[in-house]
Design a protein with these regions (language model features):
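Glycine- and other small-residue-rich loops at beta-strand/loop junctions that grip anionic moieties
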Residues: 145, 165, 196-200, 221-223, ...
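C-terminal hydrophobic helical "lid"/dimerization subdomain
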Residues: 4-13, 273, 323-396
Length: 396
């Protein structure tokens, strides 16, 4: 495949995309590659999607930092971006659940060979080699178009089109909390009253939202002292924001009580051990942060172990999400719009217009102050300009 920008193959319609060269640090660049066709998907189940917006996050930053990521077999580059949102352009002959003009989001992980992949829960795969669009061995969504099987494409209600780019991050929360409730069926009766969220970034904010939609009292811990946008967003949900600069998580719990469920989304591994010490009896702690490095900490291991054993406590990790969680995320987002108005749109702080501005996109992701969700405005929606959708000009 010819990925050189400006070197167009004769007779092939090309498109632009943002890619990296896996294993090479700071290699993000613009490529030109053939526009995909629905015919590459068997059994008439292909769907061609025009990309409108793609969110970027720490995963994209780490891939560009050459920490992980692999190109598809036969290519020397990986199109990044796993938080895609777009509109259907064309469907195969046997696609009945989608039509041209539908807003959609595609899942990220693709099936492997394990029993979990076979039954549709590829997010629980036991395969050592896995396939994730924009992350590992499959091209992502930071391109003008993509094609996939209808099985992996989820319809988004039109009322969510302005916030649809948040659906994939929402699935991280949705899976973790759903798994926690599934685990707690061991108790026969479990009605959590108090929840804690570790971290006030995008995932922490969405976790706070999901807990509040379920009527649970929430305390969200972040490092930065309030007031700032994230703390305002948390308090607008009726939750409490606490800065760990002012009080530690264990000290807060000693003064105010333990938590029935804790969702960790801080990206700071030592706080996991603080969370373990603030979990109530029969409680469940969900870990969602992917932490590299080799940080070491000293912890009261015997006491933590004793409390977990005597308190019947559970700690579980969660990663990725299958179609089920994309569908339930859309439902929760719709409920959030009804209950909290423009709350979700306030998370979309930094739009960057155009794939050609990839350098600015990554500079914003890495350096922008006050950023919650940085995203690329890739294409236009029915002729509407891709600027000023969120109260500021794209690229600002």
């Amino acid at each position: 495949m010819d990925a050189g920008i400006g070197r167009v193959k004769i007779g092939i319609i090309n498109m632009k995309a943002i890619a990296v060269k896996p294993g090479i640090k700071d290699s993000v660049h613009l490529v030109e590659m053939p526009k995909p066709e629905i015919g590459v998907i068997p059994n008439g189940r292909g769907v061609l999607v025009k990309v409108l917006r793609v969110g970027v996050d720490g995963t994209d930053k780490e891939i560009n930092n050459a920490e992980y990521g692999a190109a598809p077999v036969g290519d020397n580059f990986l199109v990044i971006g796993h938080e895609g949102f777009g509109v259907v352009e064309e469907v195969g002959a046997n696609v009945t659940e989608l039509k041209k003009g539908d807003y959609v989001v595609a899942t990220v992980r693709r099936p492997g060979t394990s029993i979990f992949d076979i039954i549709g829960t590829n997010d629980m795969t036991t395969d050592d080699t896995y396939f994730e669009r924009g992350i590992n061995l499959r091209h992502g969504y930071l391109s003008e178009f993509y094609v996939d099987d209808a099985e992996f494409i989820v319809k988004v209600p039109r009322g969510l089109k302005d916030v649809g780019v948040l659906l994939e991050p929402m699935t991280v929360v949705q899976k973790g909390i759903t798994q926690a409730y599934e685990i707690q069926r061991r108790l026969k009766v479990w009605k959590p009253r108090r929840a804690a969220v570790m971290g006030a970034g995008t995932i922490g904010l969405l976790a706070t939202l999901v807990f509040r939609l379920r009527g649970i009292e929430v305390v969200t811990f972040g490092r930065k002292p309030k007031p700032y946008l994230n703390s305002d967003l948390i308090e607008d949900l009726g939750a409490e924001y606490i800065s760990t600069i002012n009080i530690s998580v264990p000290d807060y719990a000693k003064q105010n009580g333990a938590f029935d469920i804790i969702f960790e989304a801080s990206g700071f591994s030592p706080i996991v051990f603080d969370a373990m010490q603030t979990l109530a009896k029969n409680g469940v702690l969900v870990l969602s942060s992917v932490t590299g490095g080799d940080r070491m900490v000293e912890v009261p291991a015997d006491r933590i172990n004793l409390d977990f054993v005597l308190g019947n406590k559970v700690m579980v990790g969660t990663v990725n999400a299958n179609r089920e969680y994309f569908e339930t995320s859309a439902k929760d987002m719709a409920q959030a719009v009804l209950e909290y108005g423009d709350w979700l749109s306030r998370l979309l702080t930094h739009p960057i217009a155009g794939l050609e501005n990839h350098a600015h996109l990554f500079d914003t992701l890495i350096n922008a102050k006050g950023a919650i969700k940085v995203f690329c405005e890739v294409g236009e929606d029915a002729g509407r300009p891709t600027t000023n959708s969120y109260g500021q000009a794209s690229g600002s």
